Amino acid sequence: MKWHKFHTLGHTMSLFRLLALSFVLLMAEGDAYSQLRKGSKREPLINEWGIGYGAGSPFGATEWRSVKNSEFTQKFSQMWQLNIGHQFTSKDYGAAPKGYYYPTLGMFFQWLDYSHLKIRGVEPIFPKRKTADFGQIATFGITLHQYCWTSGKWRGYLNHETGAAYVFNPVYEVPSWVTLSKPWQIFVGFGWFFAYEIKGGEIAFGPQFTHLSNSGLANYNTGINNFSLSLRYRHKSIREIQKCKPEEALIEKDGRKFKSHFYGSVMAGYGKVYFEDPNSAVQITIMADAMYKIDPNNGIGVGFDYYHNDNPDRTDRQDYIGAGIKYDRWFGPFVIHVQVGSYLNGKRPIKYKGTARIYENVGYKYVMFRHKPISPYIGFYTKGNGFEAEQMSFALGCTFH
């Protein structure tokens, strides 16, 4: 029976909005052993527990899970896991004051890519190894939290008549529980990790980038783009694992998917602007971007983009032009791209007199014909100013390779 080992370093979420924030982190990762021999019905069962800590995240937890993997593809495996933890704010966000604590319950699904690794055949009891594995993951999931614990500095209650999530009075009060009006979060993310094996377990470290669609806090319930660094220890026990020769377990990285280092796309769709005017009208967005990548298949490159937002309620934010560093990562027909740089914004008519501002753009696309030079796609993206998500859009577009 052939089987593979690879590592994942997961997360939940973390606020990239202010780099000075420091939070406790949940990291969610899993192992997978797959690609069984033809005709074999035996599958390995991996039991794990672990605990982790990180800087830059509002979520911390311990979790336990069992993972049973069947043959998914030669590149990917999947894992469900349940996490129980906590979340708290370290800064005032809208109506939610500093020091609030949220118990959470979350379910996560990870799509794990190990096509870039040279998988080794190893003993069921993990030996010490001085080399570190490097990998990437894509993650999405949902967290649930219904109550929040006050720090004792503020008093709050749920106002059902006005529809407001909270009404806070600046009166000192003993710590107490209040109910959240939006007790859920959905997030999508990706990241990298280094994993170093020790006997019976693993130590892993790496960054994670995440987009949250709902923070669960009043007046702060729109898109948030986050970044975290995580450190994790994992204990592992494995059953029903058959050994195989190391040379039988090797998987080489796929060849290049595209002939060109150039990548570009155009799109048009409907979006909505948040934070500065949460009640603003839905707007039409047109975007074009181009990128030169060192690796034509996946990797880091440089590029520029242009946005036009047609919204009569926001005449001061009609056109943007920017340049920065881009990163693309493919998962089958899905691609996740991130760009960080600076942009100039102009008023109508277009006059780029504003100062350059830090911005980021995160996108998730489903490309119809990934290996074709030109292909239509459907996608979702957010554009942020100073790492605050200002705009979220669904769109139809076309890619060029």
Language-model region placement:
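Short glycine/proline- and aromatic-enriched beta-strand/turn motifs that initiate or cap beta-hairpins
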Residues: 35-89, 234-236, 244-291, 399-401
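Outer-envelope beta-barrel architecture signal
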Residues: 43-49, 99-105, 152-158, 199-203, ...
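Residues that define the transmembrane beta-barrel architecture of outer-membrane proteins
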Residues: 45, 74-82, 101, 132-140, ...
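Glycine- and aromatic-enriched membrane insertion/assembly motifs of diderm outer-membrane
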Residues: 46-50, 71-121, 278-335
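Transmembrane beta-strands of outer-membrane beta-barrel pores
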Residues: 53-59, 109-115, 162-170, 198, ...
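Residues on the lipid-exposed face of transmembrane beta-strands in outer-membrane beta-barrel proteins
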Residues: 82-90, 140-148, 160-164, 188-196, ...
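Solvent-exposed loop/turn segments connecting transmembrane beta-strands
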Residues: 134, 152, 216-221, 274-282, ...
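Outer-membrane beta-barrel "beta-signal"
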Residues: 225-246, 389-401
